[in-house]
Amino acid sequence: MTPIEEHYNVLVKRDDLCFPPPAPPFSKCRGIIEHLRRLKREGIEYVGYTETSISMAGWGVAWACKELGLKAVLFDPQYKQTPEVLKYHRQQWKQFDPIIVPIQAG
C-alpha cells in the first residue's frame, strides 16, 4: 500500500468545469479557439466541419464559432440507423445555430 504523505499541494484541472454548459467539454474547445480567432482575423466568416463519426467535435466547433461571431457549417452524415447518442449531439449543435448540411453516409 502506498503511504499518504501530508503537506503537499496538489492542483487538479477539471476539464469538465472549464467551459460551463451549454458548452461542450473543454477537451473539444481548447485547441480550436485560437485557430478560429486567427481565421477570423484573416476575414473568414464561415467555418465548415465534416462530422465523420459520433463525436463531440461538431458540438465544439458550433460552440466556438458562436462565441467568436463566426458561422459554423456542419456537414452531418445521415446513417440508416441513427444512434441515440448522435441524436443527442445534434440537439447540442442546434443550440448554437449552425448551418447543418445533411450528407449521404456510406
Predicted region positions:
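Positively charged, low-complexity intrinsically disordered leader regions
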Residues: 1-45
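Conserved beta-strand segments of alpha/beta enzyme cores
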Residues: 9-11, 71, 99-100
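Fold-independent oxyanion-binding glycine-rich loops
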Residues: 13-17, 52, 103
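Short active-site-adjacent helix-start/loop capping segments
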Residues: 21, 55-60, 81-85
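Conserved active-site and cofactor/substrate-binding residues in soluble primary-metabolism enzymes
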Residues: 26-30, 56, 88
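A short, small-residue-rich loop immediately preceding and capping a beta-strand
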Residues: 43-62, 68-77
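Small/polar-residue-rich loop-to-helix segments that shape phosphate-bearing ligand pockets
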Residues: 78-106
